[in-house]
C-alpha cells in the first residue's frame, strides 16, 4: 500500500495506480490515471489488462458543461453508478474504438475549454458522474477528490 501523497505524486506524473474500493461496494480494484495525462499506451494497457470498460469520472459541473445526461432516468443498478451516455470526440478520431481514439476523446472531454460542441454521443468512452462529498462518502474512484480520472 502507498500513502495518499505517493499516489497523488504518481498520478501527477502520469502513472497508473490501482484504487481498491470498499469491500461492501464492488470489492474490486480499478486502474486509475489522471485524465489529463492519458495517452494511447495507457488506454491500451487498461483495455488489455483491466478487461473492463474505459470510464471517465467527471464532476457534476463538467457533466453539465458537456451536456451529459444520465444513461437512465431510473438507476436500478445495485451500486447506483452514475453512468452518463457514452461519448466520442467530434474531431481527431476515426472509428472511436482504438486506444488512440479513446485517449483523444478523454482529452477532449477534460479540456478546460470543452463544451458540448466538442463531444458526440454515443461513443466508446463511458463517463461517470462523481459523487458529491468526496472520499468520506465512500472509498471508490467516483469519490476521489479530483476533477477527472480515467
PLM ranges: what are they?
Residues 140-146:
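Conserved small/polar residues in nucleotide/adenosyl-binding loops
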Residues 6-8, 43-46, 70-76, 114-117, ...:
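A generic local secondary-structure boundary/capping motif
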Residues 42-99:
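Glycine-rich, N-terminal phosphate-binding loop and its surrounding beta-alpha-beta segment
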Residues 148-150:
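Hydrophobic alpha-helical segments, chiefly the membrane-spanning helices
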Amino acid at each position: 500500500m502507498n500513502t495518499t501523497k505517493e499516489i497523488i505524486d504518481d498520478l501527477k506524473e502520469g502513472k497508473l495506480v490501482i484504487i481498491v474500493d470498499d469491500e461492501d461496494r464492488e470489492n474490486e480494484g480499478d486502474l486509475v490515471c489522471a485524465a489529463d495525462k492519458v495517452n494511447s499506451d495507457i488506454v491500451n494497457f487498461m483495455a488489455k489488462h483491466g478487461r473492463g470498460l474505459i470510464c471517465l469520472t467527471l464532476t457534476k459541473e463538467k457533466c453539465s458543461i458537456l451536456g451529459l445526461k444520465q444513461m437512465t432516468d431510473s438507476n436500478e443498478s445495485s451500486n447506483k453508478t452514475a453512468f452518463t451516455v457514452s461519448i466520442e470526440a467530434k474531431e481527431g478520431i476515426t472509428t472511436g474504438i482504438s486506444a488512440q481514439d479513446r485517449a483523444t476523446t478523454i482529452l477532449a472531454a477534460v479540456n478546460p475549454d470543452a463544451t458540448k460542441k466538442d463531444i458526440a454521443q454515443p461513443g466508446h468512452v463511458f463517463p461517470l458522474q462523481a459523487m458529491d462529498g468526496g472520499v468520506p462518502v465512500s472509498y471508490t474512484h467516483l469519490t476521489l477528490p479530483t476533477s477527472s480520472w480515467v
